[in-house]
């Protein structure tokens, strides 16, 4: 399976910098270790014998990025990453070439006592309860959730339909529709969601929003499959 990394370095001085990228699970594999002369670096490499990620087998690797200047460590970042492929073939949703049935629920950040102030322990309890009842998918109705939710879904194994914060319930027959005054705001919400969450293996589908009026532009979105609730 191919792994592609886009790295952007925010620094005024670009000289004498070296970037090292490592993939770690049972063993370490160096993906990249070179001097760089640009603030944006693209790395593409082939990974053999990958253990794929699914809700039943949530195999995660750790990617470590290390920045050196004059061979002295400057800064590092690490994050979990799962390898999986999604596609629709003859109307069947496949993950890693195998048909998947989504047995999912809509989930709000809510607690009978704490209200909308959800802490990490409460969120993890939600996920554990869902897994114990054979739920394998979550729709983040009706907004992107805290980053912690996606980390939990990566780790425990739940598929996620990630929903943009776009809803005009009650006035959806005329807002936002094709009103160009709303276009930049709508695009901004979707783009920020995708940029933030695209590296999570659990996210298998993007939702454009919930009950926000179907527009002509939505019929020409150049992606294989989309979700827009209520329209």
Regions found by a protein language model. Give the residues of each.
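Aromatic- and acidic-residue-enriched carbohydrate-binding clefts of CAZyme catalytic domains
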Residues: 103-108, 163-180, 186, 190, ...
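Secreted/periplasmic carbohydrate-active enzymes, especially glycoside hydrolases
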Residues: 1-152, 156-160, 188-189, 204-205, ...
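Active-site neighborhood of glycoside hydrolase catalytic domains
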Residues: 182-228
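Short, flexible turn/loop "capping" segments at secondary-structure junctions
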Residues: 130, 167, 198-200
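Acidic-residue sensor for enzyme active/binding pockets
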Residues: 56, 163, 211
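Extracytoplasmic/secreted cell-surface and envelope-processing proteins
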Residues: 148-149, 169-172, 215-217
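Short, hinge-like loop/turn segments at secondary-structure boundaries
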Residues: 156-158, 178-181
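Solvent-exposed loop/turn segments at secondary-structure junctions
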Residues: 144-145, 166-168, 210-214
